[in-house]
Amino acid sequence: VNLKIRQGDYVILTGENGSGKSTFLKLLLRELIPQQGSIKMFEKDISGGFKGMKIGYVPQNSISKNQNFPATVEEIMRTGLYEPIWKRGISGKKYQKKILEALSEMEMDSFLTSRIGELSGGQQQRVMLARALVGKPELLILDEPTTGMDSVSIQSLCEVLQKRNEKGLTILMVSHGSLKPYTGANRFWNAQEGRIIEE
């Protein structure tokens, strides 16, 4: 696989189960080491790792479905910084404001004190996206973020991502089905039998 992602790209990667989407993500996230080929990000070969680049990652089904899972939405959000607050010179009040702003963007600010396990799958994904965005990443990677969402929620999510992309955020979203009707993505990739083809 030889792929390039340019700064400011909004890429959608689709494909059936077993087509190679998960393997590609594992290569990108360094869970697997490529035996050949390369992955270039912002004109730099990242096959050896991101080397300090700020990455926001929203994994699929990343939260426990146990309704008694003790963490609250606020506690989940507080893990979204790349460095401790004191290192960044951010006061507790300012960070609390950032948390609320990120949750508000995802229409989840009213759930701040709710247990994450009590939320629906779609609501949990919204919280995880807000968590990924609160640290101001350079690249946002999303693995099946629309799982459990209806068409209205998908449209709302994609509008948020589009606005972020227009402000310069580079996005790579993996999806089982086509999201062309919903997104303003500028590139569409399709995984087929271990190969990734640009449409």
How should these model regions be labeled?
Residues 37-51:
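Conserved ABC transporter NBD signature motif
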